[in-house]
């Protein structure tokens, strides 16, 4: 580089170095802009996912309270007399059969 620098005037060398610095600064600025855009996209996506998870939390809370009430009513019915036990067994068998029929029709609909 010493031979190259001696062959040109000091002003020309400074101009070449200045142009190289500007080119590298522009390249760095474009990379920083891309990184900033990427960071903003990640932030937006994280906020959307947090809102979605908050909505799911409220859905699960309401479903938990619904299932808790159903289990309490089912337990009360199971603890009552012998006639209700026959009804309970009939309902359980009916629900199981309905589940298998529904799953059969859904599997047929997919194929």
From Swiss-Prot:
Keyword entries, A-Z: Coiled coil, Golgi apparatus, Membrane, Phosphoprotein, Protein transport, Transmembrane, Transmembrane helix, Transport
A Gene Ontology cellular-component term: membrane
Single GO MF descriptor: SNAP receptor activity
Predominant location: Golgi
Gene3D superfamilies for this protein: 1.20.5.110
Organism domain of life: Eukaryota
Residues modified as Phosphoserine: 9, 37
Positions in the Cytoplasmic compartment: 1-86
Annotated transmembrane regions: 87-107
UniProt record, GO biological process: protein transport; regulation of retrograde vesicle-mediated transport, Golgi to ER; retrograde transport, endosome to Golgi
Compartments, record wording: Golgi apparatus membrane; Golgi apparatus, trans-Golgi network membrane
Positions in the Lumenal compartment: 108-111
Topology with respect to the bilayer: Single-pass type IV membrane protein
PROSITE patterns (alphabetical): T_SNARE (PS50192)
Keyword Nucleotide-binding: no
Alphabetized PANTHER family for the sequence: GOLGI SNARE BET1-RELATED (PTHR12791)
Quaternary state and interactors: Component of a SNARE complex consisting of STX5, YKT6, GOSR1 and BET1L. Interacts with STX5.
Function field: Vesicle SNARE required for targeting and fusion of retrograde transport vesicles with the Golgi complex. Required for the integrity of the Golgi complex.
This protein's name: BET1-like protein
Organism annotation: Homo sapiens
Lineage of source species: Eukaryota, Metazoa, Chordata, Craniata, Vertebrata
């Amino acid at each position: 580089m010493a031979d190259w620098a001696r062959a040109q005037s000091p002003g020309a060398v400074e101009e070449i170095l200045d142009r190289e610095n500007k080119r590298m600064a522009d390249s760095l600025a474009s990379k920083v802009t891309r990184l900033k855009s990427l960071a903003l996209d990640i932030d937006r996506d994280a906020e959307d996912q947090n809102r979605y998870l908050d909505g799911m939390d409220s859905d699960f809370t309401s479903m938990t309270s619904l299932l808790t009430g159903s289990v309490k009513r089912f337990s009360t019915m199971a603890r009552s007399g012998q006639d209700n036990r026959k009804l309970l067994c009939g309902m359980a068998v009916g629900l199981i059969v309905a589940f298998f029929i529904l799953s059969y029709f859904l599997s047929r609909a997919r194929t």
